[in-house]
Amino acid sequence: MNRREVRCAFSASKAARAQLLLRGKVRLEPLPTRPRTVLGLDASYSAKDGVGVGAAVLISLETLEPVDCRVYISRVCIPYIPGLLAFRELAVMAPAAAALSAEADVVMVDGHGIAHPRRFGIASHVGVILERPSIGVAKKKLVGTLVEGPGGMYVVQDGERLAIVLGTRPREVYVSPGHRITLEEAASIARATIRPGGWMPEPTRLADVISKALKTIIGGQSLINSALASLCRVKLGPRLEELERPLRRAGLEVE
């Protein structure tokens, strides 16, 4: 596929102001019921083609097995800017999540929740937009200092615990509440979804695997687990018809 530059008007300062306004909608409160399903969201990008791949994987908390998987592929015009990840990734993650056959009890996003310079990372943004409890799971710390406390190591800023660290370097993740959940609940769910011997929660791990695999297919290779391929359904954005054949050849169902 030939490279196509996709440009759009984007103001980082306006986006940051929007985050400050939207964070007023964030509520950190206990879950109303015990969750049974968790949705993992992640996105990957083919820089050569300017295409983003958003993956939404719904898993059972009881078995940690995927029960549904949707992918949305589209051209992306917003650049990567630290702290403003949601404005780039929601363009492909939100349509993937909307295509799922059932709503998740909790959404887990590869990125931060309130452990963010404006207390409104991508997990908080997703939670507010989808109106679902959300958790951020990130591989790097954005703000705060590490302080040891009861139950583990915490990310603390201005006396507030924003996230808890699971694992040890270099195999560690920073778990923070995004919306409609407490830090303790977010940590408990994240721990419960890490398989023995692993270090990443299964919902975001699978979403990461799938989004990167499809990015590889877009780049001209075929590398995807056949079991995942049989589960995932893919929707293409405008003017991406040329991707349908290689995706079908890789065993994916294209809608």
From Swiss-Prot:
Membrane-spanning residues: none
Cofactor: Mg(2+)
Location(s) in or outside the cell: Cytoplasm
One Pfam family named in its UniProt record: Endonuclease_5
UniProt GO molecular function: deoxyribonuclease V activity; magnesium ion binding; RNA endonuclease activity, producing 5'-phosphomonoesters; single-stranded RNA binding
EC numbers on record: 3.1.21.7
Binding site for Mg(2+): 42, 110
Reactions it catalyzes: Endonucleolytic cleavage at apurinic or apyrimidinic sites to products with a 5'-phosphate
Protein name: Endonuclease V
Phylogenetic placement of the source organism: Archaea, Thermoproteota, Thermoprotei, Desulfurococcales, Desulfurococcaceae
